[in-house]
């Protein structure tokens, strides 16, 4: 018997308080008191009954001494499994109770079976749940820790479960638990009364502080803290006190919350744990908590150590240890809608990227300054970030570990550094604070937006921060070194430059190097030594990107409407930028045989949606022969017309191109809106009128161009045997009697419009302005003759002469044959014929002044097709 008592005494001296309490719990004895008191209670069972009466136990324990010894031996064997040192290595002295086993730093209350519940029972049953913390992993009773929201319902098992101590450590990472004098105590709800009010409740507990614990909490970085937590809180990691909570520690009242007692804690609110270091003392301490709340809480007392901001920041994983750069880049691509090309090739997502890049603000949502270290919570699906240091500093006081972008609650262990945006912010550290935006493409490439300290940051970078390869600007090769084309915006009128100069003799000639094929100006005539092959190759540029050719198009749409074009006659490639909309019908030379058009020589231009519209064939041609006096340039049309002719003034210095100034430099003229031509070497043109029934007739004009510089006459075929002679008409005069034929023509101010400077003489013109526009006969196709005008400009002295007889051309309407276009000056002079839409009784619209040479508006259904007949020169 003595050996049994001696063996049990040695084992009891080795036990911790928890093992002693566990033994006393199995024996049915009280578990309060110091460790020596607990040992004495167990040893008393191994002695006589006098010891039991001495300790004041009123009932005799039914267990025998052998049963008590067996319980002690089983407990000792369990501790041996946990690597307890062998008793043989220790002194067998019965009075050796000074040995104190090393307790675990995280939680001293951790049984060998790792079963710890707030109900203080270590029994294992069928309904258990384990903590997910790798350092804890304790098992708890499911019914004790999972509380349903409504009574009678079953509690929902969370996907990730943490015990109350692990939740406490994550609620405020600036406090780390160093000990638990009072383990979690469940504050069970007492229900409500019949009138629906909660029943006041209070619980009183005692905890013991040893001398070492007391000395620890007296240190500056340690404190004794009381905490409380709602078991089924929606915000898992926070403290929360019940309503009307009142706390007393050793009889001293302690305030727990600053909000009113009746106010519930909101979803974004946080409660703090009061510090009771000044209220505690060494030894036994009593704590009492009362409340009026039907919810289930648990509270406890812990020894906590403060952490600094730097220490908390060190808990955040480094950039290399956190998320990989590939995952961060994939998230950015997903958020911008670009995604990975290989993975999302078959994606049918509704998100479409419209902009080439997205502007991302690098300002921290908390501080408003540019982020230094880009931080984020790992579970967040957005790409927004915040400044890591600022976020941690703010949470030292607020204890709200919540994403400022999506407002979801997390813990410190979910905080990380974003590797994608952190590379960008690290490159911007030397920039000014106003540089806080970057443009990010869907593939992850980026550039700094704004004035950066370095020009390299304003260039596009790869996602990893390296510079993108600069794209080389590929300029189209010119067909000829003398041919240049300069593009401009649609903000204003540009100019048309022709490379000609006046020689010392007063004769205009091409201002370039000598060339066998370049045309020369001799005796007021344009001649070409090679049969005028200078205009063989014509490069055409469209005037209307929308192909509508309307005078009311938005200039922002017609980006190609205004260009600088250099027309050089010293090479074989010349640019006709959208010739006049109403330049005649066709061209013909009598010295060439007439040929029928081939299918390949016809180009049909139409913006109609209908595919089977009837084509308008070219009915008439321009006869490229001279008149009786050898100086005519007859134009043949069908309809009522007028012939006006003016002879130039053969003064000194006014040659065939006397309209120009005496400056020896290249002259410059404004570029009017021209109709689009097409790149064919042939010279046949057919344009359409206002009437949908126009088939083989061309709309007549009431006037023609008297081309004074080269002594040309514009002859009109009026459909009768003789030409009609009329008085000279006014030049582009704005009149209400015109009925909209020329809508507020600004050319009425002769000499003011720069577009006509190329046709004005060098001296003041004496052309009388007359007007006779009333009672005119309609053309056979229904278009009134007042719908056609001509700009008659000439040098002084010839304006009052009688017009020469018209060269009437009554030949049948035949297709155009091969011909060569006359020199550029002749063609440019004839390209000003303007067709204006007939609008009976319409008022003049001043808003269309700037579009005097534009094509008239027509509905799509009445706009006929254009048949462009071009004959190829076989030579």
UniProtKB/Swiss-Prot annotation:
Annotated Polar residues bias: 808-819
Start and end residues of each SAP domain: 12-46
Keyword line: Metal-binding, Nucleus, Transferase, Ubl conjugation pathway, Zinc, Zinc-finger
GO molecular function: SUMO ligase activity; zinc ion binding
InterPro entries: SAP_dom, SAP_dom_sf, SIZ1/2_SP-RING, Zinc_finger_PHD-type_CS, Znf_FYVE_PHD, Znf_MIZ, Znf_PHD, Znf_PHD-finger
Positions with a binding annotation for Zn(2+): 380, 382, 403, 406
A GO biological process held by the record: protein sumoylation
Gene3D superfamilies, sorted: SAP domain, Zinc/RING finger domain, C3HC4 (zinc finger)
Main location: nucleus
Zinc fingers (SP-RING-type) by residue: 349-430
GO cellular component, one term: chromatin
Residues annotated as transmembrane: none
Pathway(s) per entry: Protein modification; protein sumoylation
Location of the region described as Disordered in the Swiss-Prot/TrEMBL record: 796-820
SMART domains: PHD (SM00249), SAP (SM00513)
Cysteines engaged in disulfide bonds, as pairs: none
Entry keyword annotation includes S-adenosyl-L-methionine: no
Zinc finger (PHD-type) residue numbers: 114-169
Compartments, record wording: Nucleus
Enzyme Commission number(s) of this protein: 2.3.2.-
Domain of life: Eukaryota
Function: Probable SUMO E3 ligase that may regulate Pi starvation responses.
Family that this chain belongs to: Belongs to the PIAS family.
Protein name in UniProt: E3 SUMO-protein ligase SIZ1
Species in which this protein is naturally found: Oryza sativa subsp. japonica (Rice)
Gene field: SIZ1
């Amino acid at each position: 018997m003595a050996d049994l008592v001696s063996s049990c005494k040695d084992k009891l001296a080795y036990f911790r308080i928890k093992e002693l309490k566990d033994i006393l719990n199995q024996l049915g004895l009280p578990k309060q008191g110091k460790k020596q008191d607990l040992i004495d209670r167990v040893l008393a069972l191994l002695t006589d009954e006098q010891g039991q009466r001495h300790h004041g136990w009123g009932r005799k324990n039914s267990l025998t001494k052998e049963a008590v010894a067996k319980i002690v031996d089983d407990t000792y064997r369990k501790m041996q499994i946990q690597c307890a040192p062998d008793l043989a290595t220790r002194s067998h002295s019965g009075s050796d109770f000074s040995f104190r086993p090393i307790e675990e730093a995280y939680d001293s209350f951790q049984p060998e079976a790792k079963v710890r519940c707030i109900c203080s029972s270590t029994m294992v049953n069928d309904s258990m749940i384990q903590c997910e913390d790798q350092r804890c992993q304790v098992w708890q009773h499911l019914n004790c820790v999972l509380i349903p929201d409504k009574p009678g319902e079953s509690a929902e098992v969370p996907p990730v479960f943490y015990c109350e101590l692990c939740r406490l450590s994550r609620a405020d990472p600036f406090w780390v638990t160093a000990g638990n004098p009072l383990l979690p105590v469940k504050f069970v709800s007492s229900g409500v009364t019949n009138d629906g009010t909660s029943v006041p409740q209070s619980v009183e507990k005692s905890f013991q502080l040893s001398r070492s614990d007391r000395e620890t909490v007296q240190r500056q970085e340690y404190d004794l803290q009381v905490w409380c937590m709602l078991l089924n809180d929606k915000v898992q990691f926070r403290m929360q006190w019940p309503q009307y909570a009142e706390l007393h520690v050793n009889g001293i009242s302690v305030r727990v919350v600053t909000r009113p007692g009746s106010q519930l804690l909101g979803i974004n609110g946080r409660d703090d744990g009061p510090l009771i270091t000044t209220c505690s003392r060494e030894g036994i301490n009593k704590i009492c908590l009362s409340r009026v709340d039907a919810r289930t809480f648990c509270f406890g007392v812990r020894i906590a150590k403060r952490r600094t901001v730097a220490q908390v920041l060190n808990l955040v994983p480094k950039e290399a240890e956190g998320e990989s750069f590939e995952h961060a880049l994939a998230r950015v691509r997903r958020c911008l809608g670009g995604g990975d090309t290989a993975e999302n090739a078959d994606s049918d997502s509704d998100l479409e990227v419209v902009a080439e890049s997205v502007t991302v603000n690098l300002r921290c949502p908390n501080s408003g300054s540019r982020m230094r270290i880009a931080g984020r919570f790992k579970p967040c699906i957005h790409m927004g970030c915040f400044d890591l240091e600022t976020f941690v500093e703010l949470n030292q006081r607020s204890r709200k570990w919540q994403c400022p972008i999506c407002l979801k609650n997390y813990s410190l262990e979910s905080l990380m550094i974003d590797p994608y945006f952190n590379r960008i912010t690290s490159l911007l550290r030397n920039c000014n604070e106003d540089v806080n935006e970057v443009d990010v493409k869907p593939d992850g490439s980026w550039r700094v937006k704004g004035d950066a300290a370095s020009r390299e940051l304003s260039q596009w970078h790869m996602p990893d921060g390296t510079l993108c390869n600069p794209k080389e600007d590929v300029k189209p090769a010119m067909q000829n070194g003398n041919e240049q084309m300069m593009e401009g915006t649609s903000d204003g009128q540009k100019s048309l430059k022709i490379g000609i100069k006046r020689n010392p003799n007063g004769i205009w000639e091409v201002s370039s190097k000598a060339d066998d094929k370049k045309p020369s100006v001799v005796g007021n005539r344009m001649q070409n030594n090679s049969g005028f092959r200078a205009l063989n190759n014509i490069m055409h540029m469209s005037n209307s990107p929308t192909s509508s050719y309307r005078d009311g198009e938005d200039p922002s749409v017609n980006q190609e409407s205004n260009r600088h074009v250099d027309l050089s006659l010293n090479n074989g490639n010349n640019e006709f930028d959208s010739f006049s909309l109403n330049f005649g019908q066709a061209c013909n030379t009598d010295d060439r045989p007439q040929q029928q058009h081939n299918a390949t020589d016809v180009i049909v231009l139409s913006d109609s949606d209908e595919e089977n519209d009837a084509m308008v064939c070219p009915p008439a041609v321009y006869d490229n022969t001279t008149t009786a006096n050898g100086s005519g340039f007859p134009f043949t049309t069908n309809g009522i017309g007028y012939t006006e002719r003016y002879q130039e003034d053969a003064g000194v210095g006014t040659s065939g191109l006397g309209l120009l100034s005496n400056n020896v430099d290249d002259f410059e003229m404004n570029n009017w809106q021209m109709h689009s031509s097409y790149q064919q070497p042939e010279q046949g043109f057919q344009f359409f009128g206002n009437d949908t029934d126009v088939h083989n007739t061309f709309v007549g004009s009431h006037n023609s161009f008297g081309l004074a510089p080269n002594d040309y006459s514009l002859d009109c075929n009026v459909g009768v045997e003789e030409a009609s002679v009329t008085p000279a008409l006014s030049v582009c005069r704005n009149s209400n009697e015109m009925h909209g034929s020329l809508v507020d023509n600004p050319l009425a101010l002769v000499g003011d419009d720069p577009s006509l400077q190329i046709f004005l003489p060098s001296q003041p013109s004496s052309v009388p302005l007359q007007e006779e526009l009333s009672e005119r006969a309609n053309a056979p196709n229904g278009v009134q003759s007042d719908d056609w005008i001509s700009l008659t400009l000439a040098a002084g002295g010839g304006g009052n002469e009688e017009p020469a007889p018209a060269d009437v051309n009554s030949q049948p309407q035949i297709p155009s044959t091969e011909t060569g276009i006359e020199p550029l000056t002749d063609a440019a002079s004839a390209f000003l014929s303007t067709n204006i839409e007939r609008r009976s009784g319409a008022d003049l619209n001043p808003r269309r002044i700037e579009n005097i040479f534009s094509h008239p508006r027509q509905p799509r259904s009445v706009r006929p097709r254009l048949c462009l007949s071009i004959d190829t020169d076989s030579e």
